[in-house]
């Protein structure tokens, strides 16, 4: 939702509205689809908003495997853009113990070589250590697991050696309990590798991103008008994974990750392959 002016306590009218199906996991699935890879969105839906989410996810050519809750309704989150972007996120339904058990049943279908992306915040009723519990449950099955969550959650999964984590500078500070300055990002990304992460992709907004594993890789961000920040980080995750699945080296994977994230930021919605390709060619020429 975009506004020309905003006055607190008064009637305000928007000049542009757009309704998108969202959630970090769904954003990653849509981005993967745009890059030619099919994935299965997992998670919970509830109420009439849950029905609409399923409908819209299916409209992207995806086949969701959601668990339908019998109470509450899936969240409606508002992104309001005036001088700055303001977010209002609803609470959403509570996930009960039996609902969590249903998700573990679905995880049993994963097999060697699969990739599982654990993305976003915990629903009400879900333990803070849930992602770590999932990784422990799947340990030894040769499944690559990606975790994109707040810093405190990322810290819990490191002992299980996630294939990829994607913190930003603020989340690095959260993980280590101290302010991480821009010039310290590389140092602390390397610390995460030593703590167990296989790949650490740090998004730095308009300054690009860096990738840490056994080496360090850097990529500057292309210039452009930011129209939408929603899904940019999720697009980065998708592009990195597709590049690695295609057998490309780490520097190219980082560059394509930044290109996809930037292309999404420069458009309304998750960027399409064509827009990403154009931007990537401009970045590397």
Task: Please tell me what each predicted stretch does.
Residues 33, 139, 245:
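Gly/Ala-rich phosphate-binding loop of Rossmann-like dinucleotide-binding domains
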Residues 129-215:
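Conserved phosphate/ATP/ADP-binding segment of small-molecule kinases
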Residues 93-96, 122-126, 153-155, 174, ...:
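Short, small-residue-enriched loops and turns at beta-alpha junctions
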Residues 155, 183-285:
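Conserved phosphate-binding/catalytic region of the ribokinase-like
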Residues 37-40, 64-65, 145, 200, ...:
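Hydrophobic anchor at the start of a short beta-strand
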Residues 87-89, 113-120, 148, 166-171:
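Short beta-strands and strand-loop turn motifs
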Residues 1-42, 50-52:
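Glycine-rich phosphate/adenosyl-contacting loop at the front of the ribokinase-like
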Residues 10, 34-114, 280-285:
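Conserved N-terminal subdomain of the carbohydrate kinase-like
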């Amino acid at each position: 939702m975009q506004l020309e002016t905003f006055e607190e306590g008064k009637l305000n009218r928007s000049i542009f509205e757009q309704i998108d199906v969202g959630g970090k996991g769904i954003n990653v699935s849509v981005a993967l689809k745009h890059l030619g890879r099919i994935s299965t969105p997992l998670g919970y839906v509830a109420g009439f908003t849950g029905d609409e989410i399923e409908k819209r996810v299916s409209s992207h050519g995806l086949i969701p495997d959601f668990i339908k809750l019998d109470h509450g309704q899936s969240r409606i989150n508002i992104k309001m853009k005036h001088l700055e972007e303001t977010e209002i996120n609803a609470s959403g339904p509570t996930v009960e113990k039996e609902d969590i058990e249903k998700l573990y049943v679905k995880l049993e279908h994963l097999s060697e070589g699969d990739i599982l992306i654990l993305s976003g915040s915990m629903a009400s009723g879900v333990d803070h250590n849930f992602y770590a519990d999932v990784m422990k449950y799947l340990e030894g099955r040769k499944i690559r697991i990606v975790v994109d969550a707040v810093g405190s959650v990322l810290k819990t999964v490191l002992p299980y050696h996630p294939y990829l984590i994607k913190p930003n500078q603020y989340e690095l500070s959260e993980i280590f309990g101290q302010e991480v300055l821009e010039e310290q990002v590389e140092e602390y990304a390397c610390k995460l590798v030593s703590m167990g992460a296989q790949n650490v992709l740090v998004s730095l907004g308009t300054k690009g991103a860096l990738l840490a594993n056994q080496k360090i890789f850097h990529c500057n961000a292309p210039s452009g008008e930011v129209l939408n920040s929603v899904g940019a980080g999720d697009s980065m995750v998708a592009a990195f994974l597709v590049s690695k699945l295609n057998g490309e080296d780490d520097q190219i994977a980082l560059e394509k990750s930044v290109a996809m994230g930037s292309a999404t930021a420069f458009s309304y919605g998750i960027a399409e392959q064509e827009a990403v390709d154009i931007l990537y060619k401009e970045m590397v020429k």
